Each structure stands twice: as structure tokens, then as C-alpha cells.
Amino acid sequence: MSVLLPVRDAAPWLPSALASLARQTLADHEVIAVDDGSRDGSGEILERAARRDPRLVVRHTPGHGLPAALSLALSLARAPWVARQDADDVSHRMRLARQLEWLGAHPDANVLGTRLRLFPANATGAGMKRWAAWHNSLLTHDSMRRELLIDSPLAHGTMMARRSVLEDVGGWHERGWAEDLDLWMRLFTRGARFAKLPDVLYGWRQHRTSATRTDPRYSRERFMSLKSEALRSGLLRGGRKATLIGVGASLSRWHEMLGSRIERRMELRRPHTGAVPSLEPPLVLAVMAPVARERWRAALCGCGLRELSDFVFVA
């Protein structure tokens, strides 16, 4: 088992991350840490830890970015299975063992995540709590695939994947947007099978300097650019034009993003009555609330439409 640990300026939290990996019950693992241009002493913390634990391999780079750091770590991995961890997070001591055991019992699966918890509570906002509840509700391949244009359905740090599958799609790409969702989309397109353990085996630390909050690659605009490209190469490939359905600002943003690919725009009334008008696919539904998505999903499938072939949800 090879664990990929990219690091940049994580000194306050790195010792906890390393300790959580060192105490894994799966002793036969290696941690490949890439210090990507840290200026806060993270590199020195890694070197000291490597002298104590030969399972820790350290490389230093001048700051090429997260996708490059992950690609370097992947190239150094020796095991057929690789896992991810972020330098400011922690893994449950049974995490690697349970994921590897599950994958051994399910040879058709290629990518496996886990449920997670957010900590500390006083740094966790309402939006992240909603996201975590949504993430933890998606356990199957099909549920993650159908929500792929909502947000990343599998937290990057929880990933364990077959190394060869990652290599087959070229690993992580630098395209100026979320590298994890970009990777998931390419893996789903190539037929990789996803799953998620129902156990909470990963702790995602919340703090004001986390990349999720500060890195522009995770901005709403960049996410929408990635999703719109996926739509153009997926549901709307070949120049297909869609009916766009939604409410308010979200509807307007998606209309602007998809432009000429939108043939008709339909704004929903609030509250939505549940009645479904006669609609011709393809349909793009900018519906933010999970409960509303479920109502629309049931109604459209009840009309004989197929999700991902005739309609998709976006956010």
C-alpha cells in the first residue's frame, strides 16, 4: 500500500497527519511525501519523521502545484494500490486496513472512499456541514456518478485506488480547476468502478488557510467551467442543445456558461408544485437542494426519461 501525501506549508498540522499514518494497523505500507515548495518548515518536519520511520519517503520540489506533486508521488509508488491523504487531515487507525480488505473482497471496484467527519466543530460552517452530509449519503457507484456535476462526490483524501487505473488515465492533470473532480470524471468516463465505505475513517480539518477556501482552482467559477466542459463532451456532445431548468441566480449563471448550447430556458416557480411539464430531452436541471433533486428525479424517471442519457442535474 502506497500513501500519497502532498505537502505545502502544513507545519501546524503535519505531525498529526503523519502520526495518524504511522499508527495504521496495516503496517505494510509506505508514505510518499512530496514537499512542494514549503516555506514554513514542513520539509524539515518530514525529514525528521523519515529518520524515525523508514516507511516514509520524502521528495522536495520547488512548488509546481498539487497535480504535479501527486503525479510525482504516484510515479514513486511501489504498491498496486495507492491511497491519498492531505497534510492537514487525519486517518482513523483502521482506515487503510479496512479499505484494502474491502477492495480485496470486491475485485470489480477500482476506486474506494470512506465517509468522513469535519473538525473542529467551531471552524466548520453550515455550507461544509451540508456538503459532508451529502457526501456521506453517496455510497454506491451509481449515486456518485449521477451527482458528479453537483460537486465532488468522493473526498480526495479518502481515496484508495488501483495504481494501474490511475496511470491509465494519466493521473492528475493541471488545468486550473479542481484536480480531484477532473480525475473522477475521467475515471468514470473510462469505466472505473467507484464505491464508498459506510465507516467514518477520515477526518477533514477545517481552517481558514485550507486550499478549499483559498485556492482559486476551487472557486465556483472554476467548478462551473469544469462541469460545463463535461456537459459539452457528455450529454451535449455532437452539438446537442438542451432545455435548461432552474431558479434565480443559478439558472442565470448556467445559461451564461452554456450559452449557445441552451435552446430553451425555463424558470421554476417557488414553491415548485411537483408537476412536470411536457419536456423533450436533453434536459439540464440547475437544482441545488437535494430534496428537490430527488423529487425531479422521481418525476422524470416516472415519465420514462433516463438520468445521464436524457437529463442531468448541475449545481
For the regions a protein language model found, what residue spans apply to each?
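Catalytic core of nucleotide-sugar-dependent glycosyltransferases
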Residues: 199-200, 204-207, 213-238
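Acidic donor-binding/catalytic loop of UDP-sugar-dependent glycosyltransferases
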Residues: 41, 89-102
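Short aromatic/hydrophobic "clamp" motif used to bind/position activated sugar donors
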Residues: 82
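Flexible acidic/His/Gly-enriched loops in nucleotide-sugar-dependent glycosyltransferase catalytic domains
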Residues: 53, 66-71, 100-102, 106-165
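Conserved nucleotide-sugar donor-binding catalytic segment
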Residues: 92, 114, 138-215
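N-proximal low-complexity "stem/linker" segments adjacent to membrane-targeting elements
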Residues: 1-20
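Short, acidic, metal-binding catalytic loop of nucleotide-sugar glycosyltransferases
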Residues: 19-28
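A conserved acidic beta->alpha catalytic loop
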Residues: 35-44, 86
